[in-house]
């Protein structure tokens, strides 16, 4: 059964009430785990579970049962033009944490006129670009706080424990680019085009950019690295990877149907034909025998996970009234860029969350 866009939960509810209910279905977030937990078998001891290359994309219920397992994912981080980096006298291996990223970026910016390129692309805060920072960059502060505090659902309040780390990276972006930080609010910049033209070494974006960049920059000259922000132990960070594409198997189905479904899932992620289909349809899959999707950035994400680096989850999925929260954050960041106080950003981040949580949970 195929659900119309935005109607998956209602379609699933309807289908689960039928005599021939689906055996394989999607449980993509913690809210869905709460709703469908009774319908999910524990996948932990299944053969397909043993084929995972990481458990970073699995969802568990409050008792630790693996209710669903990720079958594909997307990632974002900092895309690096390795050719330009080398021209500036550096290698990727020189960047292992925020301190080294800062040192390299500031040196490139200092020599930008001589080199013919700068450190970072523009960080526009107009509607076309702001999500990269109010969503994806802000995620760094949300992820580490959520990791410390064990978030399983959206908290009513946040503390902003890692806001200084968010500031670290934002300052680095806006102070080491050829574009004046006072102009970022007005829009009109095209960071993707700047990167394609070789105007900057670093560009924060995701695996979805690969197809747009590959015609201008060769695979050998591109790599995605983690967003380092000055947190202890971050040299073992991976990319920011997430998904809402997670398989669950119906606990109310017959044992025979469950067995057939689990065998089919295993075939999809281990056989030559199955993994080829998965790579073509979904890109990166978190399984040991995954076929190469051809996307260099997805390979970078997988390599880091397989090396034992921790995944930086998409904690921004917890954001209450996401559009309103981000709009308030954009306004505060624009004020800060124009010489205002970081306290405004702190207020929008922390108090704004509490305000939007109340509004969303009346």
Language-model-derived ranges and their functions:
Residues 14-15, 22-23, 50-85, 116-118, ...:
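A structural signal for short loop-to-beta-strand junctions that line the ligand-binding cleft
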Residues 67-71, 76, 102-155, 200:
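Extracytoplasmic/periplasmic solute-binding protein
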Residues 44-55, 120, 124-127, 141-168, ...:
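Short, solvent-exposed loop/beta-turn-alpha elements that line the ligand-binding surface or hinge
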Residues 86, 110, 273, 292-293, ...:
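Conserved C-terminal helix/tail region of periplasmic/extracytoplasmic solute-binding proteins
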Residues 105-106, 151-185:
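Glycine-centered hinge/linker elements that transmit conformational signals in sensory
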Residues 1-55, 83-89, 96, 201-202:
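Extracytoplasmic "Venus flytrap"/periplasmic binding protein-like
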């Amino acid at each position: 059964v195929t659900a119309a866009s935005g109607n998956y939960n209602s379609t699933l509810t309807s289908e689960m009430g039928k005599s021939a209910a689906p055996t394989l279905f999607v449980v993509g977030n913690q809210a869905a785990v709460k709703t469908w937990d009774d319908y999910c078998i524990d996948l932990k001891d299944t053969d397909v579970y043993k084929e995972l290359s990481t458990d970073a994309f699995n969802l568990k219920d409050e008792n630790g049962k693996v209710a669903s397992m990720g079958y594909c994912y997307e990632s974002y981080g900092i895309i690096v033009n390795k050719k330009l980096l080398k021209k500036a006298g550096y290698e990727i291996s020189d960047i292992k944490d925020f301190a080294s990223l800062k040192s390299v970026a500031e040196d490139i910016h200092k020599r930008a006129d001589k080199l013919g390129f700068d450190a970072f692309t523009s960080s526009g805060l107009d509607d076309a670009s702001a999500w990269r920072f109010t969503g994806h960059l802000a995620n760094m502060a949300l992820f580490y706080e959520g990791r410390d505090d064990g978030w399983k659902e959206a908290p009513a309040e946040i503390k902003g424990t890692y806001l200084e780390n968010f500031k670290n990276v934002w300052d680095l972006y806006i102070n080491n680019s050829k574009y004046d930080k006072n102009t970022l609010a007005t829009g009109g910049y095209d960071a993707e085009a700047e990167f394609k033209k070789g105007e900057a070494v670093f560009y924060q974006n995701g695996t979805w950019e690969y197809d747009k960049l590959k015609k201008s920059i060769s695979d050998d000259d591109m790599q995605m690295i983690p967003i380092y922000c000055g947190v202890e132990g971050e040299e073992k960070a991976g990319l920011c990877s997430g998904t809402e594409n997670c398989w669950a198997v119906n606990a109310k189905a017959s044992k025979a149907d469950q067995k057939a479904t689990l065998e089919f899932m295993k075939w999809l992620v281990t056989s030559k034909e199955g993994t080829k289909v998965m790579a073509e349809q979904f890109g990166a899959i978190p399984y040991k025998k995954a076929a190469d999707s051809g996307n260099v950035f997805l390979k970078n994400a997988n390599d880091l996970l397989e090396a034992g680096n921790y995944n930086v989850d998409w904690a921004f999925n917890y954001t209450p009234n996401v559009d309103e929260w981000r709009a308030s954050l954009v306004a505060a960041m624009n004020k800060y860029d124009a010489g205002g106080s970081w306290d405004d950003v702190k207020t929008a981040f922390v108090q704004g969350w509490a305000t939007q949580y109340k509004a969303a949970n009346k």
